[in-house]
Amino acid sequence: MNKNLSALSLLWISITSMVGSGWLFGSLYSAHFAGPAAIIAWPLAGLLLLFVALSYAELGTMFPQSDSLACLPLYTHGRLTSVIMSSMTWFGLAILPVIETQGVIQYASNYIPGIVTHFGVYYRNTPLGYMLSLVVLMSFVLLNYFGIGLFARINAAFTVWKIIIPTLTVVSLITMSYHPENFFQYGGFMPYGWQGIMAAMSSGGVLFSLLGFRQVIIMMGEIKKPGKYIPLILAGSLLFTTLLYTGLQWSFIGSVSEQALTKGWVNLSFTGEAGPFAALAALAGMVWLSVLLYVDAFISPYSTGLVYSTTAAHMLSSMDLVIQTPQVFAKRNKYQVPWVSLGVNFLLAATMSLVLHGWQEMSAFLVAILMVSYSIGPIALVCLRKQLPNYQRPFRLQGGNLIAFIGFYVCTVGVYWAGFHSVRKLLVITVLGLVCSFLYCFIKNTHRGLDSKQALWFIVYLFGLSVFSYFGNYGGKHILPQYWDLLALLLFSLFVFGLAILSRKPSTHTRRLVAEHVQQTGKNELTK
């Protein structure tokens, strides 16, 4: 594999993937759900996701290949679990450019009439808006077609811009339009309690904005010495973006006018709210900043969508490791780019643009599907320590078993907070994906040896999440007592976590697969 990325470039990619449309909309929707207490949601989410990221730091340095994410569940639980988790990961990555494109469209609706319709803070594209979104999605394909080196050079320039503009926005709004009374009036600091904070994390775009750290793991095979740099890149990018988003939330809450809050934070409304920060800048008389933010409203989500388009193509091209897929998916052009996978992902993104509506709805759904796919990381960390105890680990996580369980619990509550509306879609897509996978395996006569027994834990997990979500307090029936639902989810997570570890494949299976894989990649690191 060509080593075309430096560690610094990968750090830029990680930051870029977490500073996209989330910074343009996350503060608005988080304040809508939690009021001023939304400022707590960002550092809390960053801390919770750190437990998940630490699990991937150890795993990533064990298997520093770009296709390692696709292989983890195959190593630990066999083919069926790997098919499910890898398909969900790929699906989530493939449609992430859709929400970044939606960010571009919603901001643009303030100066291009007729591309969106909306009711309150909920938006959907018109036919013209949909056609514009297709143009943006196609441009991702064209840019990525010319290779990872070009991608890195473009992305580095984007990242510098994406750090400067949000920082300038925070300083300008606090300096020119700051109302400290906003934090304690209109219902107080926590008008909707802790439930509002938890809703803000999943449905308000907080978790979604910070979930991009895993792009590092997917692309780490493109850099030299991943064992040295991956943990630092993961922790550093997560810390930086958490601080940046917290500052943005602070400036947003403090700069909203009294007139916009007459009906409370849940009914927050002001002129031009489709582009919230640009609108606040204009209302404060900073037209120059408003214009700059409209420019950034294209650059930030566009560059993030470019990152996701790249990583999703790499993910799809490596899925033949876990399920028999058409060989054409792995076909690369002279720039070593899986161009067929880019095209397939474009078709999926174009389809999902018709199914999902508006940035807020998209972010909640993506949190649900990504958190489920992230849950395999903490489980794999514990399983692989039992299956491959002597395998070389350039970074070994201290207290790994406890941190892994906390990370798994974070994934569980993240799905629950996303709400029943999102979990219901997740369930439908998972079932459809399983049916299609089984049909394909039967057609190719590869359905034997699917390791169905080792996948039962995931069926229990998905069914349990659906039940909790249906009876829960986030779009469900509100039957579960508030806060007791989190305790029940803790016990449920402990049960599933233990079941998943007990369901792991024998060590001989794991050693054989890893040996075969690293031999193929020329990186045989098994200790004798």
Placement of each model-derived feature along the sequence:
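Membrane-interface loop-to-helix entry segments
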Residues: A108, L128-Y178, L211, L234-L238, ...
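Terminal cytosolic tails of multi-pass membrane transporters
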Residues: M1-N4, L381-I403, R424-K528
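Hydrophobic transmembrane alpha-helices that form the core helical bundles
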Residues: Y29-F33, A41, L50-L137, V141-Y145, ...
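Membrane-interface "cap" regions at the ends of multi-pass membrane proteins
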Residues: M1-A37, L50-L54, S66, Y186-G187, ...
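Helix-loop-helix junctions that connect adjacent transmembrane segments
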Residues: M1, I39, T117-L128, A156-S290
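Helix-loop-helix connectors at the membrane interface of multi-pass transporters/channels
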Residues: L74, T101-M131, I165, E222-P226, ...
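TM-loop-TM module centered on a large, flexible mid-protein loop between adjacent transmembrane helices
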Residues: C71-L74, G78, N110-I115, I233-L306, ...
